[in-house]
């Protein structure tokens, strides 16, 4: 096989290849390390961490659906200080970049967790703006352009690592939201997060999820994700990380053709612990098939 250039830059950080994990589906990599050589990944995006521990939502909080799954886990996490103490040293054993996804209930929450990560040995921060803003009546930060710009600007001001902003698809105009994130100082954009959905137990006549609604992920959302990645990539000048239903190399290639510089594998990890490796191998096979020497010959070449 001919040597191919798989390297990409995300917000000025060099990744050996475009394949990474999607936050919330890979923990901090420990559970998967016996199945996956973490050294082969472009980056590990860890499960979201907050300034303080979060207990998450009541159970049941996972439901299978046709072509995917619903989750209402509620960003359960031990807090940023426990993450720094327990997980960074483990990940630094591997030759991969570390991206920390952060969550918050207020702008101040986001800033506090970012400040605590300032001296941590990590590479990038991913700002999850799909959280409800408790100071704005519970409206999700990511659904209002003004709030997106405000929280991005505040976090960017205190961040010591490059900042990725992760967009929710539960909006009318994804381009408007992406532009607000860039105006606030986002160095890169990742999308999409989960689509809001619901499942009903027709025999018990009640919602299957205790939280009633949850986030839909998996193959079912891929067409929506591709459309939004394509729209955003054509509207902003920062790198895009595409996700939403990626399970094969062919899926990843489609996202890169639509304009994504990086691709994140999420729900597929639950069904196949080696999904990230198979996606990477699939990209390499595609490059060999079409005699592509550099990954950039694919990105945005629709």
Curated annotation (Swiss-Prot):
Q: Name one GO cellular component term.
A: cytoplasm
Tree of life domain:
Bacteria
Gene3D superfamilies assigned:
Aldolase class I
- Show the CDD domains listed in the entry: DHOD_1B_like
PROSITE patterns assigned: DHODEHASE_2
The pathway noted for it is: Pyrimidine metabolism; UMP biosynthesis via de novo pathway; orotate from (S)-dihydroorotate (NAD(+) route): step 1/1
Q: Where in the cell is it found?
A: Cytoplasm
Q: So where does FMN get bound?
A: 23, 47-48, 101, 128, 166, 192, 218, 244-245, 266-267
GO BP annotations of the record are: 'de novo' pyrimidine nucleobase biosynthetic process; 'de novo' UMP biosynthetic process
Under which EC number(s) is this enzyme classified? 1.3.1.14
Whether Transferase counts among this entry's keywords is: no
For this UniProt record, give its keywords in alphabetical order, as a comma-separated list. Answer: Cytoplasm, Flavoprotein, FMN, NAD, Oxidoreductase, Pyrimidine biosynthesis
Please give the cofactor(s) recorded in the UniProt entry for this protein.
FMN
* UniProt binding sites for substrate: 47, 71-75, 128, 193-194
Q: Which PANTHER family does the record cross-reference, listed alphabetically?
A: DIHYDROOROTATE DEHYDROGENASE (FUMARATE), DIHYDROOROTATE DEHYDROGENASE (QUINONE), MITOCHONDRIAL-RELATED
Per the similarity annotation, which family is this?
Belongs to the dihydroorotate dehydrogenase family. Type 1 subfamily.
**What is the name attached to this protein's record?**
Dihydroorotate dehydrogenase B (NAD(+)), catalytic subunit
